[in-house]
């Protein structure tokens, strides 16, 4: 009211000038208000607006109060979010900005030291688990098993590093099953794998090791029916083996499914799981599982990302490094062959003839090369099957099963088959296309010479591959011996037939491609996270 009177006095002074005491007496509040309304009306201000001006102070106070409350709420939410991020921030972006791991928090074990145990009986495992181990003919533990399992049984987080084919799966499955035997809790462990094939094989290992203790397991991967998987999850399996995208789909959409009581998290082939395609799904998974859990990271190689991941998600982990960063098996014979690009298919067919009857994996760089090369081999009478990311899940499993059962002795694959797959007794690996990085080379040739067997790898090097090949030699620390090429007259005679077969293979590949795409493309989604080839 005082403020309004001051405004009226100012307006009145403009009209009447200086007010005398007598005039002041005449201008009672009622008269003043009447004069004020007349003045305001002349300026286009209504009585209703005057009333709103009177309430201006109280409105401002209310707005300020609401603003303060909102600010306090926002600060509280921000504080909660910061706390949550501190506990769960395990995304790729956070890993890239975090500092490197300090060596004081990790115990690196000398791989040349004497094994901690030489038989599984020394571990005091439960009888049911020992029975399964014996039925699987596991007589002597591998180095990674000997070093990792004792620490895992003590409840420690593990970073396990070992060359492919060294028994990593059993190294984390045995401690989990030992703990499960005492708890018998549903949704006890989650194992994340980068590819569908690896997920199925991990499940097979768990099923075999847990066969005597009533283990329930489930494999949740893309390319399979969501409803069938949801029903499987409602049966409350003890162990879930999954690809990140599909398990996240179920966490978001399958009613009644939760991992809030999860005890074990395993990331197999951890470096690949940390690739960009898996980042968003991994971030969400790590936010919905308990902070208090046991975590195992297993990989064939060590990367900076894994070093940083242990700082973000593991508690006082033990690093079990059984092999160096880049190492091939001692019983693997590696060689290379310099070839003219125009004769590459001819050389390949010559090698397939040379190793007739042996189990062979031919690695290519792209899906198109894998499909075309498999067709080329089939046209020329070889039992070859393709394996790549653009096949349906049933087709991929079909190719794998044919190769593993010796119905087909040649598997033509992209790098989707290079890591983690349990393919026993591969005699020869042929790098039709040399890989673009050294790690991929290690994983490819690691498909042979497994579990103490001998093996052979041959890389076909064209004039366009020399730079990549020299990088691989630099990492290996040695030069690969050159493989002798067949005589020119033999190659020329074979080249005529291979050329015709190649043309037919290209035609059939185009037909398959057109049929698969149906004249159009398709959008990539989380279920395709393990389809890394183009």
Curated annotation (Swiss-Prot):
Record remark on domains: The Q motif is unique to and characteristic of the DEAD box family of RNA helicases and controls ATP binding and hydrolysis.
Name of the featured protein: ATP-dependent rRNA helicase RRP3
Superkingdom of origin: Eukaryota
Stretches of the chain forming a coiled coil according to its record: none
Documented EC number(s): 3.6.4.13
Gene: RRP3
The family this protein is said to belong to: Belongs to the DEAD box helicase family. DDX47/RRP3 subfamily.
Domain Helicase ATP-binding: 149-320
Cellular compartments annotated: Nucleus
Any one cellular-component term (Gene Ontology): nucleus
